Amino acid sequence: MPHIASRYLAEGPRVGIRHFTHEDGAEFVARVRESKDLHRPWLFPPDTASAYAAYAERLIEDPTKAGFLVCEKDAGEGSGSTTGSIAGFVNINNIVEGAFLSGALGYGAFAHAAGRGLMREGLDLVVGYAFGPMRLHRLEINAQPGNAGSIALARSCGFRLEGYSPNMLWIDGAWRDHERWAVTAEMRA
């Protein structure tokens, strides 16, 4: 039987991760619009075709960024699952090479996938990919203290709390405090 190459960079039992493409715009924007109640006030992903195009272009072209879509795998005939449906996204921003070899993660689940463990699996795959083929050493997540879901996801993937940064990021019209969570390649070994 011939080997068929996967369209995913990494796969788990229920999801695979792949890079963003311009062709993902319509589904991504539709998922963002469906998920506004879930995302607010923490997250403001692009919700128009033009905003998605600019966002995807940065993730595709900028070497200091890497964007990954977390996609549901086919759950089998009659399951009601759509093969390849986008469940969420994980971006590695501010990638620094040289002696630092690090990046900062940002992520979001979409409403239809929330609470099903798909983002836990997807984030774990991205971390493995970052420490494997990307050869990074450290990843950091900055989460607002009240964002219990984001903090729980970071903790469940082995990130440790390293500190607190007052007025760190400008979000929704104000400077917001953040907790800093990190993981290193040695912690995952």
Residue ranges and their predicted role:
Residues 1-27, 31-35, 71-189:
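Acyl-donor (CoA/ACP) binding surface of acyl/acetyltransferases
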Residues 20, 31, 44-51, 62:
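Generic, well-ordered alpha-helical segments
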Residues 34-37, 61:
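Short helix-loop boundary/capping segments at the starts of domains
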Residues 37-57:
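Conserved GNAT-fold acetyl-CoA-binding loop/helix
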Residues 45-47, 57-59, 104-106, 179-180:
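Short, charged/polar low-complexity linear motifs in solvent-exposed/disordered segments
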Residues 57-69:
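A short helix-loop-beta-strand connector motif used in the catalytic cores of GNAT acetyltransferases and
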